[in-house]
Amino acid sequence: MREDTFFFQWWFLVSGLSFIFLLPQAFTYHTPPINPCFAHPFLPPITNPRLLKAFTALQAWKFTITSDPNGFTSNWCGPNVCNYTGVFCAPALDNPYVLTVAGIDLNHANIAGYLPLELGLLTDLALFHINSNRFQGQLPKTLKCLHLLHELDVSNNKLSGEFPSVIFSLPSLKFLDIRFNEFQGDVPSQLFDLNLDALFINDNKFQFRLPRNIGNSPVSVLVLANNDLQGSCVPPSFYKMGKTLHEIIITNSQLTGCLNREIGLLNQLTVFDVSYNNLVGSLPETIGDMKSLEQLNIAHNKFSGYIPESICRLPRLENFTYSYNFFSGEPPACLRLQEFDDRRNCLPSRPMQRSLAECKSFSSYPIDCASFGCSPPSPPPPPPPPPPPPPPPPPPPPPPPPPPPPPYVYPSPPPPPPSPPPYVYPPPPPPYVYPPPPSPPYVYPPPPPSPQPYMYPSPPCNDLPTPVHY
């Protein structure tokens, strides 16, 4: 055998053995870990079909989780999904004898991962709270199968994409919170036609204008802050929300225009915050009709004029912040509030105000609220009446008059003549004494006895006639 041939065979044999020796290690390194929930072949079967679907959904979700530093999902194993951390079971609405997964609450768990399509299997879910985590991606479209979902809170995550249109397929939804995410683009106007109680879409990257139908929303809390409203003004329909709206926050959202006097119709408001915008004009005096108002923040705008006194006399107002504007007058009632901030205005005799040149420069440009395309606002409130002029100095006192003559003393009248003694009337006559009544009535004597009847004498028997016999 040739030497080169022998060397080739020997090299091939050694190389093959090395490859065979290293092959298991290579494949073992790339093999995914075995899910411990399926490592036991003798798990009891799940006879409840609804809990079986929930088991499938939760195991698929756990598989997408990339980080769980606090171990919230460490016990998501086995068929008893009702014992999983953050999973809550309750009797089904259509069958109280069947147990279902009715709620998921993983708030503040700091979990990283994605939301899988299998979440659509949780058809009995009424509450889904996963705020303050690190979930990425988009809301799965399969959430449209959750017809019983009442509350959806995915706030403070890293969700992205356009506004999740799956929201419009949830007929039972009342509470929607998608704030502090990375959603972007337009906000559909039909969002404000939904029958919601609370709506939070603040602190995203939305770019939209306030729609004309915003007044159709029956929400009690509306937060749109820290988005780009693209210079939109407040639509007239906004003031139709007076019966339900309690809190509205639209800070730092490029809001422009003037506030209409109809804002006083929002008489249920407790919080009104439109700070850090480009609102102009004067404050409507009708804000004084919002008797429930507790927090009023209009700072960092371009309001001007005189602050109506009725605002500062609201019975429940605790904090009124109107700093960084161009107000030129404030009533003393504002200075008696529990908390107020009037810095950086044009208020005379108040500390920390704008310079006189800055105030004159701003007032040299007239404000035309109609130019913003909003409904014409009410005329600005009249300035307070000037203080009355000081009274004129009193005239010098006149010279003292001469002393009056002594009063004339009339002589006393002569004494009246003595009056005659009073007439003494004679005593009245004695009362008439009537004579006594007559004696008893006269008693007549009895009549004399009547005379005896006269008896004629009978004739003698001899004088009788003799009867004649025939």
From Swiss-Prot:
An annotated Gene Ontology molecular function: structural constituent of cell wall
Tissue expression remark: Expressed in roots.
LRR repeats: 98-122, 123-146, 147-170, 171-194, 196-217, 219-241, 243-265, 266-290, 291-314, 316-337
Locations listed in the record: Secreted, Cell wall
Post-translational modification: Hydroxylated on proline residues in the S-P-P-P-P repeat. O-glycosylated on hydroxyprolines.
Sorted UniProt keywords: Cell wall, Cell wall biogenesis/degradation, Glycoprotein, Hydroxylation, Leucine-rich repeat, Repeat, Secreted, Signal
InterPro entries: Leu-rich_rpt (IPR001611), LRR_dom_sf (IPR032675), LRR_extensin-like_regulator (IPR051582), LRR_N_plant-typ (IPR013210)
Major location (coarse): secreted
Pfam families (alphabetical): LRR_1, LRR_8, LRRNT_2
UniProt-listed SUPFAM superfamilies: L domain-like
GO CC annotations, alphabetized: extracellular region
One Gene Ontology biological process: cell wall organization
Name of protein: Leucine-rich repeat extensin-like protein 6
Organism: Arabidopsis thaliana
Phylogenetic classification of the source organism: Eukaryota, Viridiplantae, Streptophyta, Embryophyta, Tracheophyta
Gene: LRX6
